[in-house]
Design a protein with these regions (language model features):
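Active-site oxyanion-binding pockets that recognize sulfate/phosphate
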Residues: 1, 91, 98, 218, ...
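N-terminal Rossmann-like or analogous alpha/beta NTP/dinucleotide-binding catalytic cores
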Residues: 1-85, 240, 244
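Non-membrane alpha-helical structural segments and their capping/turn regions in soluble enzymes
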Residues: 5-8, 12, 102-105, 254
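Short helix-capping/linker segments at secondary-structure and domain boundaries
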Residues: 50-56, 89-96, 202-210
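A short secondary-structure junction signal
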Residues: 57-58, 92-93, 120, 153
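Internal, conserved structured core segments that host functional sites
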Residues: 66-115, 119, 140
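Conserved nucleotide- and phosphate/pyrophosphate-binding catalytic cores
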Residues: 103, 109-275
Length: 275
């Protein structure tokens, strides 16, 4: 279990990164979930119509119980219900999620649809995924499997606040293989992961250069990693500068969360009272 000090610091860091990435609190309501007790109340109410079987079949739950057998708790099992409460408490129609969250969003639609059917109403909308590009994004990790994320460990992910030196060190340690032995050989997952990240942060010319080198069996993974690290550093530079600027302004950060919580409680309170 994380210690409270770490949780508070993580919350602050996420807020700073959101603001640094360009989210404008004048247009978007930012708040801490624990500042909105109505979420916990709606979570409890939705749990009354959530079934054990469907929760146990959730892919994320099955993955978690494989990796943390010593801490399989009810919160882990019912996490999709909490996520649903987070979404539908404000009657969201569209949700910006990555590809790995598609199942949770489908479960949110299930809970919303079930509530509407049981109580003979069209109260909750059935939210759909909102994507900023042509397809839902899933940035893979540097360890060769899974997605890039904080829960998978520090070495698996590049964080927005990481220094250029740290980014370079992480990318250069990324998992690969011995290299292709046949022309146009299919890439193993660990190598494809690096190409997927390259596609997200580099130019098309850069991607094509390394694709061609791989297909011709002339690729040097060291060169690929150096280029990838350089492009990640350039891609994240504006955000990294803003993080440094914003993180020291504690008064501003508290103001953003206080005003966000007030707006969220007004919206969430209305939903819970009507439910």
């Amino acid at each position: 279990h994380p210690v409270p000090e770490d949780l508070h610091q993580n919350v602050k860091q996420v807020l700073v990164e959101y603001l640094a990435a360009g989210i404008d609190p004048k247009r978007s309501t930012l708040y801490v979930q624990s500042d909105l007790p109505e979420v916990a109340e709606l979570y409890l109410l939705l749990n009354m119509n959530a079934y054990k079987g469907e929760l146990e079949r959730c892919t994320s739950f099955k993955d978690k119980i494989k990796n943390q057998k010593e801490n399989i708790n009810s919160g882990l099992l019912t996490y999709p219900v909490l996520m649903a409460a987070d979404i539908i408490i404000h009657k969201a129609n569209m949700v910006p999620v990555g590809k790995d969250q598609e199942q949770h969003l489908e479960m949110t639609r299930t809970f919303a649809r079930r509530f509407n059917r049981i109580y003979g109403t069209e109260y909750f909308p059935e939210p759909v995924a909102y994507n900023f590009g042509k397809k839902l994004v899933k940035i893979p990790g540097l360890d060769g499997t899974g997605k890039m994320g904080k829960s998978a460990g520090d070495k698996n992910a590049v964080f927005l606040a990481d220094s250029p030196e740290v980014i370079t060190k992480k990318v250069m340690r990324a998992v690969t293989d011995g290299g292709p032995t046949k022309m146009n050989e299919q890439k193993p997952e660990s190598v494809q992961n690096l190409f997927t990240i390259l596609e997200a942060v580099s130019t098309q010319d850069t991607l094509s250069h390394f694709e061609d080198a791989y297909n011709k069996c002339t690729i040097r993974y060291g060169d690929l990693k150096k280029q990838l690290a350089q492009d990640i550093i350039s891609f994240t530079a504006p955000i990294r500068e803003r993080i440094i600027e914003i993180s020291g302004d504690k008064t501003y950060l508290k103001k953003v969360l206080k005003e966000g919580a007030e707006k969220a409680r007004e919206s969430g309170g209305k939903t819970v009272s009507e439910v």
